Amino acid sequence: MDSKYQCVKLNDSHFMPVLGFGTYAPPEVPKSKALEATKLAIEAGFRHIDSAHLYNNEEQVGLAIRSKIADGSVKREDIFYTSKLWCNSHRPELVRPALERSLKNLQLDYVDLYLVHFPVSVKPGEEVIPKDENGKILFDTVDLCATWEAMEKCKDAGLAKSIGVSNFNRRQLEMILNKPGLKYKPVCNQVECHPYFNQRKLLDFCKSKDIVLVAYSALGSHREEKWVDPNSPVLLEDPVLCALAKKHKQTPALIALRYQLQRGVVVLAKSYNEQRIRQNMQVFDFQLTSEDMKTIDGLNRNMRYLTLDIFAGPPNYPFSDEY
């Protein structure tokens, strides 16, 4: 099988490429970079592109996809595109308009996957993180089961081929799975996952329910100071990963990506650097031994880079549970 198109079958029978290109960049990075990087990624062989309303780059990412379709490089059906519903649009009547807005920005007719980005709801409006005059976040109270029903309607309407969630814990997944009248299970749960935070328990739970775990921050994280502790260890400088990279004549990033593929995790690789974008496609060109895998398992320290603790407080904050 052509390595570039290795896919996993989702519980709704659609197929998702196991290696995805992450498009998030900190706000100071010019949006034009998202356009260039996404084009480079498609040229390098990436077929799974991950973005979100929150990233404020869907116009550029959509333009990149459409330009690679226009020049004959790919067809629309070759591309697996993911967008995400932000927390200010959890109210059921706001779900479809939010997706339609993403589609308008993208200039696409449908997304392949639409995710509930984060389980905490904030007040509706233009602001992605609405705050009161004292700088406190304005939370909203929304039943996520009602949000999910609106997501199901988006799938029925053909606006999203598949629907899933992101940053949900086991309890929140079970709440959806046990919902009376559930029409479609989430196809995936996209969460932070890397050798320092390997999500073993959540992965086992997801596998038992035929839900794919998709890894973000698989290479550590963007280390944006607003979100990430600058003193946290740099994953790709880990001596064990560096030693394995040397052994396999690969980069530490490729070791971290390959680790996920071999445990049945779909992995997102985020880079705006042309050389590294091309390099990350080499994840299909080598294999880790079971000893290597055990060694990497041993690096786990249950360390999250993205605690998103500005959202802590409401009962739906997902990271207080063990998993």
Curated annotation (Swiss-Prot):
Annotated localization: Cytoplasm, Cytosol
GO molecular function: 17-alpha,20-alpha-dihydroxypregn-4-en-3-one dehydrogenase [NAD(P)+] activity; 3-beta-hydroxy-5-beta-steroid dehydrogenase (NADP+) activity; 5-alpha-androstane-3-beta,17-beta-diol dehydrogenase (NADP+) activity; androstan-3-alpha,17-beta-diol dehydrogenase (NAD+) activity; androsterone dehydrogenase (B-specific) activity; bile acid binding; carboxylic acid binding; estradiol 17-beta-dehydrogenase [NAD(P)+] activity
Pathway: Steroid metabolism
Root EC class: oxidoreductase
Enzyme Commission no: 1.1.1.-, 1.1.1.112, 1.1.1.209, 1.1.1.210
Alphabetized Pfam families for the sequence: Aldo_ket_red (PF00248)
Positions bound to substrate: 24, 117, 222, 227
Active site: 55 (proton donor)
Record keyword RNA-binding present: no
GO term, biological process aspect, one: digestion
Binding site for NADP(+): 20-24, 50, 166-167, 190, 216-222, 270-280
Catalytic reaction annotation: a 3alpha-hydroxysteroid + NADP(+) = a 3-oxosteroid + NADPH + H(+); a 3alpha-hydroxysteroid + NAD(+) = a 3-oxosteroid + NADH + H(+); (17R,20S)-17,20-dihydroxypregn-4-en-3-one + NADP(+) = 17alpha-hydroxyprogesterone + NADPH + H(+); (17R,20S)-17,20-dihydroxypregn-4-en-3-one + NAD(+) = 17alpha-hydroxyprogesterone + NADH + H(+)
Chief location category: cytoplasm
Site (Lowers pKa of active site Tyr): 84
Keyword Cell inner membrane part of the UniProt annotation: no
SUPFAM superfamilies tied to this protein: NAD(P)-linked oxidoreductase
Site (Important for substrate specificity): 54
Entry keyword set: Cytoplasm, Lipid metabolism, NADP, Oxidoreductase
Family of the protein in this entry: Belongs to the aldo/keto reductase family.
Function: Cytosolic aldo-keto reductase that catalyzes the NADH and NADPH-dependent reduction of ketosteroids to hydroxysteroids. Most probably acts as a reductase in vivo since the oxidase activity measured in vitro is inhibited by physiological concentrations of NADPH. Displays a broad positional specificity acting on positions 3, 17 and 20 of steroids and regulates the metabolism of hormones like estrogens and androgens. May also reduce conjugated steroids such as 5alpha-dihydrotestosterone sulfate. Displays affinity for bile acids.
Name listed for the protein in its UniProt record: Aldo-keto reductase family 1 member C1
Annotated gene: AKR1C1
